[in-house]
Amino acid sequence: IWGIGCNPCVGDEVTALITRGEA
């Protein structure tokens, strides 16, 4: 799982959570 407009990278799950929280 990766954040919107973000390439799959280490900690993609954390990025997704942050993105959803801020989105």
Curated annotation (Swiss-Prot):
The modification (3R,4S)-4-hydroxyisoleucine is found at residue 1. One of its GO terms (molecular function) is toxin activity. The modification 4-hydroxyproline is found at residue 8. There is a cross-link at residues 2-6 (2'-cysteinyl-6'-hydroxytryptophan sulfoxide (Trp-Cys)). The modification (3R,4R)-4,5-dihydroxyisoleucine is found at residue 1. Processed by the macrocyclase-peptidase enzyme POPB to yield a toxic cyclic decapeptide. POPB first removes 10 residues from the N-terminus. Conformational trapping of the remaining peptide forces the enzyme to release this intermediate rather than proceed to macrocyclization. The enzyme rebinds the remaining peptide in a different conformation and catalyzes macrocyclization of the N-terminal 8 residues. The keyword Cell division does not apply. Residues 9-23 form a propeptide. There is a cross-link at residues 1-8 (Cyclopeptide (Ile-Pro)). Keywords: Hydroxylation, Thioether bond, Toxin. The typical symptoms of amatoxin poisoning are gastro-intestinal distress beginning 6-12 hours after ingestion, a remission phase lasting 12-24 hours, and progressive loss of liver function culminating in death within 3-5 days. One of the few effective treatments is liver transplantation. Belongs to the MSDIN fungal toxin family. Major toxin belonging to the bicyclic octapeptides amatoxins that acts by binding non-competitively to RNA polymerase II and greatly slowing the elongation of transcripts from target promoters. This is Alpha-amanitin proprotein. The lineage of its organism: Eukaryota, Fungi, Dikarya, Basidiomycota, Agaricomycotina.
